[in-house]
Structure formats: C-alpha cells, structure tokens
Amino acid sequence: MSRAARATVNLSALRANLRTARAAAPQQRIMAVIKSDGYGHGLAVVAGALTGHAEAFAVTDADEAEALRAAGFRERIVLLQGPFAVDDLARAAAADLELVIHAHWQVEALAQAQLASPVTVWLKVDSGMHRLGFPPEEVQDAWRRLTEASCVRADIGFLTHLACADDRDDPATERQLETFQAACDGLPGPRSAANSAGVLGWPASHYDWVRPGIMLYGASPFVDGRDEQPALQPAMAFQGRVVAVRHLRAGDPVGYGATWSCPEAMPVGVVSIGYGDGYPRHAPSGTPVEVAGQRTRLVGRISMDMLAVDLRGLDPVAEGDPAILWGGAVRAEEVAGACGTIAYELFCRMPPRVRREPVDGETL
C-alpha cells in the first residue's frame, strides 16, 4: 500500500473559475497565470484544462514556457519576468514566446539582437509597486527605443502589477491605475493591469487583457475582511490517510516538544502528511482539517511525515480513512489564515513526492 500523500486537481473547477473571471470581465481577453508549476497544481495539468478557454498563458521564465511547447501547447505564452540573459531572446524567438520588458539592459539587448523571427513584447510600467518596471517618466522613451528595434513586433503592449488590489478599500489601487494610464497616454497597444483581485474587485483595471491567477485555483484573492467573497471552486484537495488511531489519557502529550496535551481521555488520529509534503510545520493546534468527511482540528506539532488530529465528537474513524488537509470542507484560505500565510504559498510549496492526480468532475 502506498503512503497516499496526493493532491487531486479538479479540472472542472479550474474551468469554472476561469468562467467566473470571464463573467467579471466579459469584453477582455484572458491571460491565465500558470507560473510556479501552475501554482503547484501541475503546469501541464492546468494548461490542458484551460486550453481553448484562455487566450494566453503567463509563466515566469523560458524553462516553463519551453516545457509547455514541448508538451504541444500552441497558445500565446508570456514570460512575466522577461529575459534573464541575452540568450533568452533567441529562445523566445524560437518558441514564439512573448517577453515582458522591465529593464534598460533588456531594451538594449533587443536593439542589438539578430533573431530568427521577431518577438512580441510587453513594456512593464512601475505604477507604484516598486518591484519591476520602468518609472512612469521613462516609459515613453523605452517604448520609442523598442519601436526602433527590428526584432520587436509592432504591437507593443503595456503591463503593470497592482500591489494592494486584495484590499478593496485601499485607495492605492486607484492611484496606481491613474499612474499607469498617464504613463501610457497617447501610446498605441494593448494594456493589462488586473490580477485576480483586479478582475473581481476593480473593473477600472480591466483594460484589454486580464491576468487571473490565484482565483483560477479556487482561492479568494481578497484579504480585506468584507463579507462578500467570490464564488470560487477549490481546484485542489490535499489528501492523506489515517495510519493510526490512538486512545490517550488525560494529560498525555502529543508530538514533538510536548506542546499540546490531552485535556481528557480521548482518541487521536495520526495522518500520513507532514512538512515533508509541504504542510506548514508552524500550523498551530486548532488548524482545521477534514477526517473521514468530518471537520476537526490539528493537535500538537507537525512532523516531517505525519500530523495528529483530534477525533473527539466524531463518528468512528478507522485506519485507512481519508484525511483532507485543504479542499472540500476546509478551504486553503482557512489553513493559510491559521498559519499566518496565504493560500498561494500552501499551493506552491508542495514537493514532487505529493502525487498530482487530475480528475474531471464535481467530486475531489
């Protein structure tokens, strides 16, 4: 019998969440963000589910893009961090990849490049996040230099990233959009600013292309505490199995460091998932988990390959019963909130030893 640490990936949920993005921005084209191995869901798995539904894919670098091309995907692919070195330009031309250009050296490299075919580029504007991109006062000159490069296609796009859109009450997003619009004023070409939070919460950010990311995987992009949340379907169920049921006495400690002790005589389940599977070691006692279809909580510290759960008040649980760490009744956002992190990190930190198993239906 295998250890059974696995993550089922619901292809129907991925497509349903993309339809939610489409409904929020019906006039725009969709650049589905599938970087970081499809947010941990599997790059080719996610691309396969969304082929024919998104107009383009966005990944981090040429390695991810070339993997998609090798797997047969012909959609437009945008490299969100652009070229990391001059030789990435030839790779982009060979694989028909689109480049986000955010630095002067990239502009100069394109000006001097002799490529087998021209490339499409997106000029990144630093509208206020201060991570990558050209300051607003440099955008016009950078655009002019790109138009003079013989290896750059004429339809240069403009792109920015929103730093605070996850808080629908933060005025920083409006300021960023004003900065972006002013920086690109009078220049032709498509615009893109909306991440998942922009798609769902900031219609003014939609422009020509939207870039849904975390929402495709069923997690809310918002952190502002408003009651209204998007109706998104979790695409991943992270699952293990109960490998032991222990009947402990009042006062018995559980796990490393004896940080948690049984308040009464009680059953405790041991589940075959640990921090070696990407589950956060710092998850506190009380973090929600589903066991045998019933909601309960963690007790004690997380081990490398195991964790313990409270079985009090549940219908009988037996060895071999399923445990779902997130997905189903327990959302990844709940686990992330208990751990002081975000769902993005939970998805992306999952290692290869956790099997990804695509399913195409309503049941995870």
Curated annotation (Swiss-Prot):
InterPro entries: Ala_racemase (IPR000821), Ala_racemase/Decarboxylase_C (IPR009006), Ala_racemase_C (IPR011079), Ala_racemase_N (IPR001608), Ala_racemase_pyridoxalP-BS (IPR020622), PLP-binding_barrel (IPR029066). Its EC number is 5.1.1.1. Keywords: Isomerase, Pyridoxal phosphate. Pathway: Amino-acid biosynthesis; D-alanine biosynthesis; D-alanine from L-alanine: step 1/1. Its cofactor is pyridoxal 5'-phosphate. Gene3D superfamilies: Alanine racemase (3.20.20.10), Lyase, Ornithine Decarboxylase, Chain A, domain 1 (2.40.37.10). Transmembrane segments: none annotated. Catalyzes the interconversion of L-alanine and D-alanine. May also act on other amino acids. This is Alanine racemase. It comes from Halorhodospira halophila (strain DSM 244 / SL1) (Ectothiorhodospira halophila (strain DSM 244 / SL1)). The gene is alr.
